[in-house]
Amino acid sequence: MDPFRFQVEARAGRARVGRLFTPHGAVETPLFMPVGTAGSVKGLMPKDLEAIGSQVLLTNTYHLLLRPGPERVRALGGLHGFAGWKGPWLTDSGGFQVMSLGHMRRIDEEGVVFQSHLDGRLIKLTPERSIAVQEALGADLIMAFDECPPYPSPREYLEASLERTLRWLERSLKAKTRPDQALFGIAQGGTDPELRRRSTLETIRFDLPGYAIGGLAVGEPKEAMFAMVELSTRLLPEDRPRYLMGVGHPEDLVAAMGLGVDLFDCVYPTRTGRFGSALVPEGRLNLKNARFLEDRRPLEEGCDCYTCQTFGRAYLAHLVRAGEMLGGILLSLHNLRHLHRLTEAARQAIREGRYGDFAREFARRRFGREVPPWFREALAAGGHG
């Protein structure tokens, strides 16, 4: 039997609950994946992540290629043996980090030559090399090598980039040798509907175990972003998981889940925590603010995370203002649990056929009377209007 299967178990409009089977366990979707950039989620142990309901962890091919190196990880048992997380892993292809972090020297048909941000050495990353690195790392879900154009980009560049990404997908697929890893293709096209449609339809032709919506959440307006998400989920196969890359703001998750997205990742909840802010239903609490210094309340009433069950806002504000690392750790723990609770509540609402009510209640608390048009339009397009 194929170690990878995806089955849709419930629907409400275009929102759906699914179950994704991998060699390291089955997970329920929609879900949010914490990002462990260098093989760890900053400040949090695997047992902490398991306790708050994390199901899949993401790590970055680019960073692990630079250090400790893929062959060392392979020799030490792959990610599952090396990093202590026994559940499913997802590795990205390295393409986005090359564009955003590495000092890119050249991009051509062969691949990308970039200068390491660590030591300045020149490194060449091709589709074949990206797949080889991901096979050495041993994640359950791996990504085809792609080019993520910046926003805004000229249409000519977007078109050339998406065609190159499709050719790189074909090379990634040919380079793949491990049957115990599922390769996802990534659709690009920026915010151009015609190019996004073409990229999505051409990517589907490869009949892959899953598909990612790439090239969004890179600075474009929310209206444009969700128009592309709506278009993409309308075109992508119903029986495959859909992954919206780099998206982690709660309101974005609620809108995208309503359109049928299954997987999300982002550094936002942990980075926000390290910078001293907590996610709550009304938005964010900046714990650097003096008004929290005598506030005994938990960050979020009803939250079952260790942070909320143990500490008040006053203590957390003290830690943040004192620069204590524990402050960032406790806020990161809460912020991830906040997103996991959000996706858990979404799954329950979908199973009960009331996703529209769930999303409207979310919007009432998050936005008050000023619900942005893009959010309302996304809900209506998902059948929750």
Curated annotation (Swiss-Prot):
Substrate binds at residues 92-96, 146, 188, 215. The active site is at residues 92, 265. This is Queuine tRNA-ribosyltransferase. The lineage of its organism: Bacteria, Thermotogati, Deinococcota, Deinococci, Thermales. One of its GO terms (biological process) is queuosine biosynthetic process. It comes from Thermus thermophilus (strain ATCC 27634 / DSM 579 / HB8). Residues 246-252, 270-274 are annotated as: RNA binding. It holds the Pfam family TGT. GO terms for cellular component: cytosol. The keyword Transferase applies. Belongs to the queuine tRNA-ribosyltransferase family. Its EC number is 2.4.2.29. Binds 1 zinc ion per subunit. Its cofactor is Zn(2+). It catalyses: 7-aminomethyl-7-carbaguanine + guanosine(34) in tRNA = 7-aminomethyl-7-carbaguanosine(34) in tRNA + guanine. Keywords: Glycosyltransferase, Metal-binding, Queuosine biosynthesis, Transferase, tRNA processing, Zinc. Zn(2+) binds at residues 303, 305, 308, 334. Homodimer. Within each dimer, one monomer is responsible for RNA recognition and catalysis, while the other monomer binds to the replacement base PreQ1. Catalyzes the base-exchange of a guanine (G) residue with the queuine precursor 7-aminomethyl-7-deazaguanine (PreQ1) at position 34 (anticodon wobble position) in tRNAs with GU(N) anticodons (tRNA-Asp, -Asn, -His and -Tyr). Catalysis occurs through a double-displacement mechanism. The nucleophile active site attacks the C1' of nucleotide 34 to detach the guanine base from the RNA, forming a covalent enzyme-RNA intermediate. The proton acceptor active site deprotonates the incoming PreQ1, allowing a nucleophilic attack on the C1' of the ribose to form the product.
